[in-house]
C-alpha cells in the first residue's frame, strides 16, 4: 500500500512505499500493557481489604422504554427532557453490551443491529467514509460525538464508545442542519468514581488480531482518570489484498465526580492505514448480458486495485473540555468546548471509471480509473445550556435551553495519478485521448482475473485545495410539560444562523501535472428555524402512546449528501442565486411499553417523511432549473430490547419503508422533454424491508449461546436524491445474514467469547453507487476473544 507523504505530495515521481503496518508484536504489546495492568491490579485487589456495597439495579432506556440492566443506556443529551418512554420520537439506544457481544468494531457493525439504516457507497462526489442513510436520507453530516457535530468524512472506531444513540426522522430541532433522515450520537466512555481495569485480546481468521485496554483509576471519590487503548490489524474476509491497521488512545480526567461541579477533560486519537476497496464492476461497463441486478458476476475476491499504489490513511483528534454545575437539585448548567481535526487521505482504484471494458484477444480487459481525496478538517465548537425542572403556572416543566457556536474548516484536494509505467494494455485495446492525457497509457487488467500485484510507476501530484469555512450560531429550547400523570406535551425549537464561505477550485492537468487553476470565491448565509411537537398519553406508568411532528433544514451542498461540501449556488439560471435549504417534515405516531415486569422493551411507530426544494431541471432550456424536487418515505417500524426470560436476551426490530421520488429532473431526448425515468421509483439506499435480531441465551451459569439474523430487501444504488438505481436500474439484491455467538465465563474475572460473523459465508452486496461499482460485504470470519477484568 503506497502513501505519499505530505512533503512530497506536490512532487512528481512515485516510489512504491509499503504502508506502516501495526505489527502483530505491536498489537501484542498493547495487549500486554493492558492485561499486565489488569493482572497486577487483580492480584493487588485480591491481597487488599476492599469495602463493598450491595449492587443496585439501574434502568436502561433502549428503543424508548426501560429495562433492568447493570448499566444506564439513557441518551447522554440533556435535550431529551423526558425518559425515552415519554419522548414522542423514534430513538434507539444501542448499549455497550450489544456492541461487545456482536464483536462490533465499526459504525457499520453497530448500526447493523438497528433496522432501517443502510450505508451508501463512495464516489459520485462522495468521500470514502461512513455514509449512513436513515429513512432514505444520507446522514453522514449528522454524526455527533457526545452531542457535538463530528465534521469530515471519516471511518470511525468503537473502542472508546459507551453506547450509540440513533434519532430517526427530521430532527433539526435537536441537531441543527441535517439531511432530514435523522442523526447518530456516539457517546464516549468517561471516568467513573471506582477503580477497574478491563483488557481484551481477540484473534481470528484472515489474520485478525485486536487488543484493547480500558483502565479506570479513582484517586478518591471525586477525582478519576480513564484511559482506553486500541491496536488492531487484519484482512477483510472474502476480499483479496484488502487489509487494515488501526491504533488509538483516549485518556480522560474527571474532577468533582460527587460534587456540585464536575470538570472533565478528554482527548481522543485514532490513526488508520488501510487498503481502500471500491469493489467490483457493473455490467454497464461491458457488453456482456446484464445480470438482474446489473452487477457483474465476478469472483467475490476480485480486487481491481494496485497494492503498491492504493492507500487510505485517516486521522482523528478530538480534545474536549466540559464543566457541569448543579445550581440546585432542579437546575444545572453545562459548558462544553471542543477542538477537533481529522484527515481523510486516499487513492483508490475505481473499477468502472477508466472507460468501458473491451473484449480483446479473446478476453475482457479494463483500464483502471482512480478516485482520490485529501481532506483535512478543523472544528472549534462551544455549547452552553441550562436544564432542569421547574413549576410554571401550576404545571411541571422539564426543560433545556442552550446556545451553540461552531466554526468548521475543511480543505478538499485531489491527486493526479498519471501512469508512466504499468501493466500493459493488449494490442487492439483503445484508449480515449482525454484518458491518455489524464491517466496515461497502460494500467490495464483482466476483468475476470484482476492482478493486484501489477507494478505501477507514475506521477502523483496533489492539486490546489478548495477551502470552506462554515460558521453556526444557534439557540434552542426543549420543554416537556406535564399536564397530569397521563398527559404530556413535548416541545422543541431551534433557530440557526448558518454562514458558509470559501473558494472553489477547478483544475486541468496533463501527464500528471496541473497546468491551470481557476479559483472561484463564494459565500452564502441562511437563517432557518425548526420545530418539533409531540403529545404523549400514558395508559400506564410504563407505557405511552404519542403523535409528533418534526422538521429539518438541509443547506445546499449538504443536500447532496457530501459531509464536506457547502456549495451555496445552483446550476443554470440558479448559478448566481443563493439556493434555499431543502425542507423536511415528518409526522409520526407510535407506542412504547415495558412488559414482563419491566424487563422487555417494546416500541412501534408509523411515519411519513417528505423532503422538498431539491434543485432539478424542469424544462428544455439550460436555464430551466427550479427548486421543486421532492421525495417521500412512509412506513412503520418495530423494536424490541431486553429479556424475554431471566436467561434470554433479545435486541432488534423490523422496518418497512415505502419510498418514492415524487418529482425529479426531466431529461432531454432529441430536443424533446422526457419525464424522469426514475420518477415514482424507490429512493437509493432505502430497502422496503429490513429486519435485525441479536439474541443470547444463558444455557448454564458459565455458558451463553446466541447469534444474529439480519435481512435487507432489494436496495437501489445511488446517492442522496437518487432513485431506482439510476438510468441503469442498478440494485443490491436482498440477502439474509447470520452471525453466531458463544461465551464461557471461566471465572468472575475471566471469560472467552467466540463470534462467527456471516456464518453461512453469504455472498451479498453491501452497497452500490449505481454508476461504477458495487461493494461486496465481508465473508465469513471467526473471532475468539479473551477478556479479563477486575
Report each predicted region and the residues it spans.
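Acidic, small-polar-rich N-terminal luminal/periplasmic segments of exported/outer-membrane proteins
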Residues: 61-194, 589
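Outer-membrane beta-barrel translocator/receptor signature
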Residues: 159-162, 173-249, 257-261, 317, ...
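C-terminal beta-signal and adjacent terminal beta-strands/loops
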Residues: 2-4, 711-721, 743-790
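Membrane-embedded beta-barrel scaffold of Gram-negative outer-membrane proteins
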Residues: 324-338, 342-348, 545-546, 578-665, ...
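Gram-negative outer-membrane beta-barrel transporters
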Residues: 599-600, 608-610, 627-721, 760, ...
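N-terminal Sec signal peptide and the immediately downstream disordered periplasmic leader
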Residues: 1-102, 108-114, 382, 671
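Acidic/polar loop-and-plug regions of large Gram-negative outer-membrane beta-barrel proteins
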Residues: 232-237, 249-256, 260-326, 342-377, ...
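Structural signature of Gram-negative outer-membrane beta-barrels, strongest in the C-terminal barrel
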Residues: 254-258, 377, 396-408, 466-609, ...
